[in-house]
Amino acid sequence: MAVLLAAVLASSLYLQVAADFDGRWPRQIVSSIGLCRYGGRIDCCWGWARQSWGQCQPVCQPQCKHGECVGPNKCKCHPGFAGKTCNQDLNECGLKPRPCKHRCMNTFGSYKCYCLNGYMLLPDGSCSSALSCSMANCQYGCDVVKGQVRCQCPSPGLQLAPDGRTCVDIDECATGRVSCPRFRQCVNTFGSYICKCHTGFDLMYIGGKYQCHDIDECSLGQHQCSSYARCYNIHGSYKCQCRDGYEGDGLNCVYIPKVMIEPSGPIHMPERNGTISKGDGGHANRIPDAGSTRWPLKTPYIPPVITNRPTSKPTTRPTPNPTPQPTPPPPPPLPTEPRTTPLPPTPERPSTRPTTIAPATSTTTRVITVDNRIQTDPQKPRGDVFIPRQPTNDLFEIFEIERGVSADEEVKDDPGILIHSCNFDHGLCGWIREKDSDLHWETARDPAGGQYLTVSAAKAPGGKAARLVLRLGHLMHSGDLCLSFRHKVTGLHSGTLQVFVRKHGTHGAALWGRNGGHGWRQTQITLRGADVKSVIFKGEKRRGHTGEIGLDDVSLKRGRC
């Protein structure tokens, strides 16, 4: 009986515990999505949110960008996207097998198939031979629209030409379709356009964006002002102003000579200490004594005329004092009278001169008359002045210099002097086109203004060349030279531009060469040695080369670059 009562008590306790279960171990119901049983209670599972009674929706954090949430933090991406949150573009063109037969171009969230010329794109992405497209002979392929063949252009900046086959460029700058930001100008390109900073501005990243910033040409040394001028930076450019004492446009400043005009009339200078009088209002200046000697210094030879004007004879009285006392001389007829003081006689070197009339001594004062006029013919040319000996100073004729001055010294005295310059706007300036060359240098019009030289197109197969020669003549003894020129070698298979020098007989190896690039460039080459007879530009082209070789602004200066 006691055992039975214990069993009943234990079973009642078990039932009470089961009734108080809080649902900590939920069990998902198989027949429902996102529903779980928490003991005797049914609710949404973890990672699901209740939308309506009996329906639960999964929760994804972060949300799916290009897809839908199918489970807790589980996204199903739309076609063309990938990634955990479907935020990445899927490159279908890189999949295997490739989705396109000929050409594939990936786009955001999708892709496009293109066919080669002569083929037509089918709806399934494959390409099929289209006789109509081949007959259309489109420049960039074709498309069939409503049973009609239509040529296509690959860029929105291109449009079909009137012939319906080729594509021509749309000048967005001229039509006004686009507007560039401040301080930029629109530059049209084939199929598009660019906004380029104006001249004097540079594109810089400022304040989180790209802006055209003014270039300080003065501080960067990118100006053409003369060395005797000041450079002032202005917005988008600069200006030059000659310094005090110089005049010009700022690019070329010439020294203004200072002319000092003296009063008319000769200047009388006494041999010893005295005063110098200029005209009626002269200023008295004392001539200092020469050292400790009592005798006047020997006057050096000078070109002005020296006039000896004797004074009256002073009488000498027989007194114990050996020094005679001369009488003051009468005033000369000149408007200004120099004061002269006769020297007392000494035992070592008396200043009196005996005369044939009487044994009395007399003193003679020499008055120096200086002419302040400029002498037309110098007595002797200076040794550091270079004098052309020819009647005409032609550039390529004989140019002699003063004897005793070598070419090296001439370069040191005047380095960087321009001896030749040519921009080919008015001819070849002494350059010679070799007639035996296969090709020839021809002048071409520069869109920016002026002319430049270019190599003609090759018409025969094989290597062809055009040579342009400048003979230096006697300038080859000028020492080192600096050759400066602008050039361009642009386009597909443009050819080669080279520089040679001829010293003895034929020219040697090329000093410089270029076979490609983009746009105009500036180059300087130092021609070493004093035996360079000629400078040669050689442009090579082959048949079928569509590029261009250009040459402009050639100059030669003394000294190294």
Curated annotation (Swiss-Prot):
UniProt biased composition (Low complexity): 307-316, 352-366
Residue ranges of every copy of the EGF-like domain listed in the record: 52-87, 89-128, 132-168, 169-213, 214-254
Ranges spanned by the short sequence motif Integrin interaction, renumbered to the chain: 382-384
Compositional bias segments (type: Pro residues): 317-348
Domain MAM: 420-561
Region (Disordered): 266-370
Keyword Ribonucleoprotein in record: no
Disruption phenotype: Mice display renal agenesis at birth due to a developmental delay. This delay is associated with a reduced expression of Gdnf and is similar to the one found in mice lacking Itga8.
S-S bridge residues: 56-69, 60-75, 77-86, 93-104, 100-113, 115-127, 173-186, 180-195, 197-212, 218-231, 225-240, 242-253
Pfam families: EGF_CA, MAM
Principal localisation: secreted
Function summary: Functional ligand of integrin alpha-8/beta-1 in kidney development. Regulates the expression of GDNF with integrin alpha-8/beta-1 which is essential for kidney development. May also play a role in the development and function of various tissues, regulating cell adhesion, spreading and survival through the binding of several integrins.
UniProt similarity note: Belongs to the nephronectin family.
Name this protein carries in UniProt: Nephronectin
Lineage: Eukaryota, Metazoa, Chordata, Craniata, Vertebrata
Gene: Npnt
